[in-house]
């Protein structure tokens, strides 16, 4: 067997000394090996290196060598429990280091794109529209995009109109939760920063480089001695803290930079075009407000989340204002000051005499510093008041409690709204401008205030539709309606709900004891009203109804909102935007009919918020990728979502209503994930119009927002794609022949998928036995249960996230591709000439190209050799025949799909046209093999113990204690392999 160094040399065709990724990968691997040799016993370290060498052998060979695979299995099976855990930790560490390295390289390449400012000629032939659009794989910068638009003679007025209407909303979610501990994330950031310093080695001395490598090794050794697993199940507030970390550390400062890059690109290419508003891109969050299937998210938790968000923003503003006070040392002896600012100082002196006494002498000739001292005091008081409210809870109001011992704090002048804070900052900015001075820090802070306000991110409430209908059912039972609500057909329900919405009479009687579920449903609406009273409507104005099936689902929420004071009947205005979430394929097909029923109701239209210069009503509508995929498979899900968007946009236009589509995309392809740029470009032409809302799932937050330039890259990618798609007149989506073909493909794919997943009685048992789904549920990574209903074991109760997670761990990745091959094959059997049409679609239609690209990428990660090992080793003997049949179906579909995808793309290998991605996937595919075999070994031992009779029948008390500890450690080892494979595959669910 060759040594690792010899194997690295044998792999020279894949490594370029000039490629920073390859160069630094060798550095990372050397450090990884060095740390393991220092931290592990010598024979154990040798076996780990042997596993790594065998992985390299597999990487060099085109196909997995059975000899090498058997050697890996032999080594894994020879390991005792402690060594297995060390091996799982070692390979998990390796993949996390590789992930850091790839992120750093992505960040550097993005930065380099700004240094190639004069290389415009290379872009001249790249047409962002029509057929050439589909051939663009790499995202573009603002500068590149505006340059191309100018070359294509896109009128400045058309671009400006779009920019002024642009409304991009990115919504952070907790689930699927990031599997890596927050503690480990901090270590990863430090490693990334050290790598960044090493990468500029041409500016460093030999001693500097040596010192940095020593620091890097020290950090990795500390990491090795840190527990990777969460020690406790995170609370919802823990999840809130995790998500808000990215706002604190990265996004707060990144957003003004994003705006600056747009400004620079416009000045260069469209100097007369007005900038978009500061809030063209804002943020939302479901963390702490998404209560669908999560009983831990209570009204109190949502209230605490809002207070926590405001606390973080106030702390950032206090810090920024303090820095401004240090900077703005302008003296009245050398500069004029606006009369408005001087008048405000006089008002502040009266309202804050203690600040005047403390600061007036020091700042008697420095008005900006004095003004900022008053601002700091107001911010401090606002923060103290916020802390009191967080402790008191949502049912408590400081203003209403006259006996509150801290009432004197309220009587002082805190900021009652972010507008008051903005006004004070504008006074400073305008005064500086009036004397021909500017201050970038003031402008930056104002931009941050416009984007984040005091609330940081809007909290979307989400709840499942039956919770509302159950509450109204209980209410109407109490009221003794002539006909029970649940017995009314849909038309009757709509009429009854409409009548109740139009009456001023209260429906819900006071002082009635409701069931716990109904009482909490009512309390959510009461809490939202209190939130808006305290924070303003910005904090919480969207209510997402998951599993929306009918018009009554939306009207029920509106009725509850009306009863809790969230609808002003006199003005016909609602303080809550009701957002249906259509998730299953059948619901997606029915969505246009449901919305048309609602749009025909005058009172419903009047309740829609009005936006834009034309003051038109807007409807937000969410499309679910996860459950539609789990329901009908990848191809059917994507096509029905595509068709629904077109139908809904046509319906909205007909009714003179604006549409904002909310895409519930996950991190994995099986849940709508994939490159954001290609996904947005593939949206049907005419459906965006500058407006889009997208979920940013917990598992992808680190890969997108952990580093400043990565965050800017992602934000710029999304924005340029929205601009590009919105300005495209792409008539390819309306090609009848293409639509008919896609409809046939989607239906055939759906039938094949459902035949395996929903109609095969052995599939659920197969999934439970040959994937680590049960062990995944024991990972302490999420506050939300893996199943919608407690105790349920059926497929319908299993959430889409663990469904995808389980298939990914066992290397099937089935939800992301199964059924595609059969659909293509059936079409080509009926007409072999269709292959040419499919190739045309791949070349010219962004939607179809995106589909094939996602399938191709997913297929490249599938490893049926490893998957078969899961089946053979973990499957029970009594199910061997049925499991073998299922595997044969999956294997046949995989080979069929792979061959037809290659036939459509015209390539010989998967990912042949994307070298960087191919090398990354190949590296991971081979190096992850030992982890898969380790996982199987640990799962087998764990499950064997679990299946044995009660231990007390055979062992004394002492041995029982040892046996229990061993079972716990086996689970720990299995969970560590789950961590490692998730890092290697770069996603969970």
From Swiss-Prot:
Keyword Transcription regulation on this protein? no
Cofactor(s) essential for the protein: Mg(2+)
Q: What reaction gets catalysed by this protein? A: oxaloacetate + phosphate = phosphoenolpyruvate + hydrogencarbonate
Keyword list, A-Z: Carbon dioxide fixation, Lyase, Magnesium
Q: Name one GO cellular component term.
A: cytosol
**Biological process (GO) annotations?**
carbon fixation; oxaloacetate metabolic process; tricarboxylic acid cycle
> One Pfam family this chain carries?
PEPcase
Uppermost EC category: lyase
- Catalytic site: 175, 630
InterPro entries linked: PEP_COase (IPR021135), PEP_COase_bac/pln-type (IPR022805), PEP_COase_Lys_AS (IPR018129), PEPCASE_His_AS (IPR033129), Pyrv/PenolPyrv_kinase-like_dom (IPR015813)
Q: What is its EC number?
A: 4.1.1.31
Q: Which cysteines are joined by disulfide bonds?
A: none
Q: Which domain of life is it from?
A: Bacteria
GO MF, one annotated term: magnesium ion binding
NCBIfam families for this protein: PRK00009.1
Family the UniProt entry places it in: Belongs to the PEPCase type 1 family.
Function (record text): Forms oxaloacetate, a four-carbon dicarboxylic acid source for the tricarboxylic acid cycle.
Q: Under which name does UniProt file this protein?
A: Phosphoenolpyruvate carboxylase
């Amino acid at each position: 067997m060759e040594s690792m160094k010899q194997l690295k040399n044998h792999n020279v065709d894949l490594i370029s000394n000039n490629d920073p990724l390859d160069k630094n990968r060798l550095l990372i691997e050397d450090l990884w090996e060095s740390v393991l040799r220092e931290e592990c016993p010598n024979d154990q370290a040798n076996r780990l290196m042997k596993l790594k060498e065998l992985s390299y052998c597999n990487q060099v060979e085109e196909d997995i060598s059975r000899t090498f695979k058997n050697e890996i299995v032999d080594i894994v099976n020879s390991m005792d429990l402690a060594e297995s855990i060390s091996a799982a930790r070692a390979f998990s560490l390796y993949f996390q280091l590789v992930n850091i390295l790839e992120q750093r390289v992505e960040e550097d390449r993005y930065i380099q794109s700004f240094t190639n400012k004069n290389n415009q000629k290379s872009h001249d032939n790249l047409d962002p529209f029509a057929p050439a659009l589909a051939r663009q794989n790499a995202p573009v910068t603002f500068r590149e995009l505006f340059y191309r638009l100018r070359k294509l003679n896109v009128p400045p007025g058309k671009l400006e109109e779009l920019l002024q209407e642009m409304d991009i909303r990115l919504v952070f979610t907790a689930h699927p939760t990031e599997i890596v501990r927050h503690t480990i994330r901090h270590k990863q950031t430090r490693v990334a920063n050290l790598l960044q310093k090493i990468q500029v080695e041409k500016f460093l001395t030999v001693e500097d480089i040596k010192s940095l490598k020593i620091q890097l090794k020290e950090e990795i050794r500390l990491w090795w001695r840190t527990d990777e697993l969460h020690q406790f199940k995170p609370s919802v507030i823990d999840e809130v803290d995790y998500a808000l970390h990215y706002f604190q550390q990265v996004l707060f400062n990144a957003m003004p930079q994003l705006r600056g890059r747009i400004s620079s690109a416009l000045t260069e290419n469209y100097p007369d075009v007005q900038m978009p508003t500061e809030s063209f891109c804002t943020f939302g969050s479901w963390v702490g407000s998404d209560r669908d299937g999560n009983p831990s998210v209570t009204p109190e938790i949502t209230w605490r989340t809002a207070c926590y968000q405001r606390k973080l923003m106030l702390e950032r503003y206090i810090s920024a204002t303090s820095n401004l006070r240090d900077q703005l040392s302008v003296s009245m002896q050398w500069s004029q000051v606006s009369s408005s600012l001087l008048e405000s100082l006089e008002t502040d002196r009266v309202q804050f005499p203690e600040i005047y006494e403390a600061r007036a002498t020091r700042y008697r000739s420095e008005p900006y510093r004095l003004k900022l001292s008053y601002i700091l005091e107001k911010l401090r008081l606002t923060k103290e008041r916020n802390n009191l409210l967080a402790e008191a809870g949502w049912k408590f109001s400081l203003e209403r409690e006259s006996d509150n011992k801290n009432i004197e704090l309220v009587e002082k002048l805190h900021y009652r709204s972010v507008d008051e804070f903005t006004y004070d900052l504008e006074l400073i900015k305008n005064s500086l401008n009036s004397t021909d001075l500017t201050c970038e820090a003031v402008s930056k802070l104002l931009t941050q205030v416009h984007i984040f306000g005091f609330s940081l991110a809007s909290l979307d409430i989400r709840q499942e539709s039956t919770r509302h209908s159950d509450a109204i059912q209980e209410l109407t039972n109490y009221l003794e309606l002539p006909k029970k609500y649940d017995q009314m057909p849909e038309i009757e329900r709509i009429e009854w709900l409409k009548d109740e919405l139009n009456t001023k009479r209260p429906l819900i009687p006071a002082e009635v004891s409701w069931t716990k579920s109904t009482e909490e449903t009512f309390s959510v609406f009461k809490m939202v009203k209190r939130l808006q009273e305290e924070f303003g409507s910005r904090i919480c104005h969207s209510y997402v109804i998951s599993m929306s099936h009918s018009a009554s689902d939306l009207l029920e929420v509106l009725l509850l909102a009306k009863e809790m004071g969230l609808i002003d009947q006199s003005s016909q205005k609602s303080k809550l935007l009701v957002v249906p979430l259509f998730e299953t394929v059948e619901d997606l097909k029915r969505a246009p009919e449901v919305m048309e029923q609602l749009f025909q109701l005058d009172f419903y239209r009047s309740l829609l918020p009005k936006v834009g210069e034309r003051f038109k009503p807007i409807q937000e509508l969410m499309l679910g990728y996860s459950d539609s995929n789990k329901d009908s498979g990848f191809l059917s899900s994507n096509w029905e979502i595509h068709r629904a968007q077109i139908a809904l946009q046509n319906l909205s236009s007909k009714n003179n209503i604006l549409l904002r589509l909310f895409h519930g995309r996950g991190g994995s392809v099986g849940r709508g994930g994939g490159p954001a740029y290609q996904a947005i470009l593939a949206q049907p032409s005419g459906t965006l119009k500058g407006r889009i809302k997208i979920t940013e799932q917990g598992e992808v937050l680190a890969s997108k927002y952990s580093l400043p330039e990565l965050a800017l890259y992602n934000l710029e990618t999304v924005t340029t794609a929205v601009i590009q798609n919105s300005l495209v007149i792409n008539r390819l989506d309306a090609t009848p022949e293409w639509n008919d073909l896609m409809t046939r493909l989607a239906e055939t794919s759906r039938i094949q998928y459902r035949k395996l997943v929903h109609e095969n009685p052995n599939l659920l048992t197969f999934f439970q036995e040959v994937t680590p789904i049960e062990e995944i549920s024991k990972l302490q990574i999420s506050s939300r249960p893996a199943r919608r209903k407690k105790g349920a074991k059926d497929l319908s109760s299993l959430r889409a996230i663990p469904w995808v997670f389980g298939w990914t761990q066992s290397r099937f990745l089935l939800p992301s591709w199964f059924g595609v091959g059969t659909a293509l094959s059936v079409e080509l059997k009926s007409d072999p000439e269709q292959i040419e049409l499919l190739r045309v679609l791949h070349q010219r239609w962004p939607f179809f190209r995106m589909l094939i690209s996602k399938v191709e990428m997913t297929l490249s990660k599938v490893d049926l050799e490893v998957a078969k090992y899961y089946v053979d080793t973990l499957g029970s003997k009594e199910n061997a025949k049925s499991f073998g049949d299922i595997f044969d179906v999956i294997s046949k579909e995989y080979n069929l799909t792979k061959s037809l995808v290659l036939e459509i793309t015209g390539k010989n290998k998967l990912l042949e046209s994307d070298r960087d991605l191919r090398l990354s996937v190949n590296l991971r595919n081979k190096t992850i093999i030992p982890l898969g075999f380790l996982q199987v070994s640990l799962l087998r031992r764990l499950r064997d113990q679990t299946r044995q009779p009660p231990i007390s029948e055979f062992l004394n008390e002492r041995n029982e204690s040892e046996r229990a500890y061993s079972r716990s450690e086996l689970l720990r080892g299995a969970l560590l392999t789950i961590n490692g494979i998730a890092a290697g595959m770069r996603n969970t669910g």
